[in-house]
């Protein structure tokens, strides 16, 4: 089955050798996504909700490039750098997925690739055959 590689032009994709998303058949896997700009720093410093909103927008765009939508998402994984961000990030998750209700995990991590980044999110989607 052929793989379709999707890039968002993020600062590390080419350098580190990965794709924003990989579509294979009826599935697409979206890599850990932050709101990092070309300089690798957050576009919404000190704003976990703003970062999450931007990240879900990037994920939505990557899904669209693969012919999928947020409605196809079956799992999300959210990583935050402090427990104080959980409520803000999960509230934004609810804005995007309230009716879709994918399986979801949120984990507190020690740090992300740049200190200005507070949130990183992955998503897996599967197109329904019904």
Functional labels for PLM-detected ranges:
Residues 1-57, 61-74, 80-130:
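N-terminal presequence-like segments and the immediate start of the first folded domain
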């Amino acid at each position: 089955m052929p793989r379709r590689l999707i890039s968002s032009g993020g600062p590390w994709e080419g350098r580190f050798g990965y794709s924003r998303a990989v579509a294979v058949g009826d599935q697409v896997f979206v890599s850990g996504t932050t709101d990092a700009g070309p300089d690798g720093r957050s576009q919404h410093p000190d704003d976990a909700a703003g970062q999450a909103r931007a990240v879900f927008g990037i994920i939505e765009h990557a899904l669209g490039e693969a012919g999928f939508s947020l409605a196809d998402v079956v799992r999300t994984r959210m990583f935050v750098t402090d427990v104080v961000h959980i409520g803000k990030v999960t509230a934004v998750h609810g804005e995007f997925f309230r009716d879709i209700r994918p399986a979801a995990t949120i984990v507190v991590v020690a740090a992300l690739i740049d200190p200005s980044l507070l949130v990183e999110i992955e998503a897996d989607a599967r197109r329904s055959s019904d």
